[in-house]
Curated annotation (Swiss-Prot):
Present with 1230 molecules/cell in log phase SD medium. tRNA methylase which 2'-O-methylates cytidine(4) in tRNA(Pro) and tRNA(Gly)(GCC), and adenosine(4) in tRNA(His). This is tRNA:m(4)X modification enzyme TRM13. Zn(2+) binds at C75, H81, H91, C95.
Length: 476
């Protein structure tokens, strides 16, 4: 084992002919596959990793090169990669992040901050959370649940027959994602979202590889093949895929492959393949209307979907839909609103943002109504604590831990008086915090989309996914 300048212990792998990084990855039981310089022991990324872990300079030189002390620093545009400090200026001009930041400059659907909260709050301002904030927030949560009568969300785990026939047989072991997709699709079916499938378009926010859209498309295609003869051949469907990241192994082609297979099995059905439009953009900066189809007299409708839309992206998405005149209000062509349904499976409330949260007034009203006399809680501090508490409901338990075990939840605060609860109580508090954030979103949707029903459901059991809450919005 090696240990450099008080850095983490590193197992030295056997030398190889290629100049391979000497860092040994214990979890994968192999050494790093990156190539290193002949003057260095490690690749640049593992050098940076070790420096972060040890909070010190790690020796990475052989011979006289050790005296030069070139330093690698995180790229200011993307801290996930590092550069030589003496080449930083040159790197910034050619960094891929520079190109990506200007990728949409000339696009009609791009407007910086369009779906943000107009700078109402600057979440970049650091808010220090104390043990007192944490304890008061927990006590306030209990009062909120008692006063607002927040019952447990209904479980609506449904099974889509197509998924059972086509998808589950392909998965002999891990079916958790398929079970979730099946339930979400069938909940959309029950909500009437697939009526008149020949004119349905879908928008998937935070689509990633678009696996969810692939199976939505598969169900849509089977519905099209079962249409009566008078409707055959008239379908015009589109999938708009929104994501800010670059994704590998995308499912876009699978949608076309599924169509080809279904078409070959039903050659007499004159159905058309759905078109696919993938847009790489942050939802914060997205104007939907330039992307969507809308002409007077058409019967096109849109269903907005997402499976595990992360943190603040859910708030930005709800604003994005509400800001679209084509989806939500009369557009410039005099057409009726095109929105038919919304289905968003939410996750990662711990990365929600108090400045961009969609319903500040709701959380503020809870704080003002239920905080104790002399409380130091404000909207900002309470929301920050909520995001921290949310992880308690989804982080799971360590092996051998019992639900009755006692934990001190303010242990990380130096000098704080102990505040002890059981493991089970901690999990419940996490779920309560998550519910408050989701409830505020639900209230926003009900106020904004008055012609729609809106509800929160548990679409699978928690043993399938701990992130098992979805918002379902459909026409009254």
């Amino acid at each position: 084992m090696l240990q450099d300048n008080n850095g983490p212990a590193v197992k030295r792998a056997k030398p190889s002919e290629r100049l391979q990084c000497e860092y040994f990855m214990e979890k994968k039981k192999r050494r790093c596959g990156m190539t290193r310089s002949s003057q260095n022991l490690y690749c640049s990324e593992h050098l940076n990793l070790m420096k972060k872990a040890a909070n010190s300079q790690v020796h990475n030189k052989n011979g006289s090169e050790a005296e030069k002390e070139r330093e690698r620093v995180p790229c200011p545009l993307d801290p996930n990669h590092t550069v030589w400090a003496d080449q930083l200026k040159k790197h910034l001009k050619k960094c891929n992040k520079t190109k990506l930041s200007h990728l949409n400059d000339d696009k009609p659907y791009y407007e910086p901050g369009y779906n943000g909260e107009n700078g109402l709050l600057s979440s970049s301002v650091k808010i220090d959370i104390t043990a007192e904030h944490l304890v008061q927030s927990i006590e306030l949560l209990y009062k909120v649940f008692e006063g607002e009568s927040m019952d447990e969300l209904p479980l609506r785990q449904l099974n889509n027959k197509l998924m059972s026939l086509k998808r589950f047989p392909q998965l002999p072991s891990n079916t958790k994602h398929a079970v979730q997709q099946s339930s979400l699709i069938e909940n959309l079916v029950d909500a009437g979202a697939f009526e008149r499938p020949e004119s349905l378009n879908f928008i998937e926010f935070g689509c990633g590889r678009a696996e969810f859209s692939r199976y939505v498309s598969l169900y849509l295609l089977t519905q099209l093949t079962s249409l009566p003869a008078e409707h055959s051949g008239s379908n015009s469907n589109e999938f708009v895929l929104i994501d800010r990241a670059t994704n590998r192994m995308k499912f876009d082609k699978k949608i076309k492959d599924d169509f080809s297979e279904i078409k070959s099995n039903s050659p007499s059905k004159p159905i058309s393949c759905p078109s696919i439009k993938r847009i790489k953009i942050d939802i914060r900066d997205l104007k939907m209307d330039p992307i969507l189809k809308s002409t007077p007299g058409d019967d096109i409708q849109y269903v907005c979907i997402s499976k595990h839309l992360c943190g603040v992206a859910t708030d930005l998405t709800l604003r994005c839909i509400g800001n679209s005149s084509i989806l939500h209000g009369d557009d410039n062509n005099g057409c009726n609103p095109k929105l038919k349904a919304i289905c968003i499976a939410m996750c990662c409330r711990h990365v929600c943002d108090y400045g961009d949260y969609v319903n500040r007034s709701y959380v503020t009203s809870l704080v003002e109504k239920y905080r104790a006399h002399g409380s130091i809680l404000t909207y900002e501090t309470f929301f920050r604590v909520l995001t921290k508490l949310c992880s308690w409901g989804t982080c799971g338990r360590k092996p051998g831990t019992a639900i009755t075990d006692i934990v001190n939840v303010v242990e990380s605060f130096e000098g704080a008086e102990p505040y002890t609860i059981t493991i089970k109580e901690r999990e419940n508090i996490g779920l309560m915090a998550r519910r408050v954030i989701d409830e505020g979103r639900l209230v926003y949707v009900k106020e904004k989309f008055t012609e729609f029903n809106a509800e929160l459901i548990r679409y699978v059991e928690s043993d399938v996914s701990l992130e098992n809450v979805a918002m379902l919005v459909y026409k009254k």
